[in-house]
């Protein structure tokens, strides 16, 4: 599976709203993201895991 890049658009409590390169937005629990994630952070999704770019 090829890595996918997401950008954190906003954080609402325990959820982050992230968008991929095409602009498609989804929300995900903060517990699944690396610590220190903030609005504007770029994330890489690879092997069923998020990491900071």
Feature map (PLM): residue ranges:
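Glycine-centered tight beta-turn/hairpin loop motif at sheet-sheet or coil-to-beta transitions
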Residues: 1, 21-23
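Structural detector for short beta-strands of small beta-barrel domains
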Residues: 1-12
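Short aromatic-glycine-enriched beta-strand elements
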Residues: 14-17
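Beta-strand/loop nucleic-acid-binding surfaces
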Residues: 24-35
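Short, Lys/Arg- and Gly-enriched loop/turn segments at beta-strand edges
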Residues: 48-53
């Amino acid at each position: 599976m090829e890595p996918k890049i997401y950008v954190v658009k906003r954080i609402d409590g325990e959820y982050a709203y992230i968008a991929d390169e095409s602009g498609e937005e989804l929300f995900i629990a903060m517990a699944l993201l690396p610590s220190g994630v903030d609005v504007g952070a770029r994330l890489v999704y690879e092997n069923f895991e998020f990491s900071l770019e």
